[in-house]
Amino acid sequence: MTERLLLILRHAEAGPHLYSGTGDIERPLTPMGHQQVAKIGAQLAKLELPGPVHVLCSPARRTRETAEGVLSALPDAAVPQIESNLYGADLDTLYGFIHATPEDIRTLLLIGHNPAIGTLAHDLAGPALQSDTFAALRHGYAPATLTVFQTQEDWMNIRPSTVRASQVLTP
């Protein structure tokens, strides 16, 4: 069986959209958000992700900036695929993207928004949330949080019982 990694990443800290005139979808990362992205990218680069790597990203500016920053830290940077349905996605939509991933993909990185992206990480982690390794997830899913799941299942069979939460990365 083939080892696969599923990476669930919430975008880094974004500025408020109040009074900006641009609306929610165009909110950029803050200076702190750019620092968070650099830290997560450096940690992700140490994981030696099995390829090919497939990246799905919401069209929101803050997720695109998160993707660009994180992927620039990887030796073989993947090009993010912008998926409009990731913006405002629910849990079923996120599982749909995972299940539709081509079988030759060894690492899938989903970059999205709360509440759905955090709900997905919590759903997949299940009882692992009780361990000290995942203490950071007990009180929400903070910006730039990335959870790594391992599996040997085909993407279409991904569910809480077929993955193992291996680590959580925070800036």
Residue ranges and their predicted role:
Residues 6, 106-109, 146:
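Residue-level preference for the first positions of well-ordered beta-strands
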Residues 47-50, 101-106:
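Glycine-rich phosphate-binding loop signature in dinucleotide/nucleotide-binding domains
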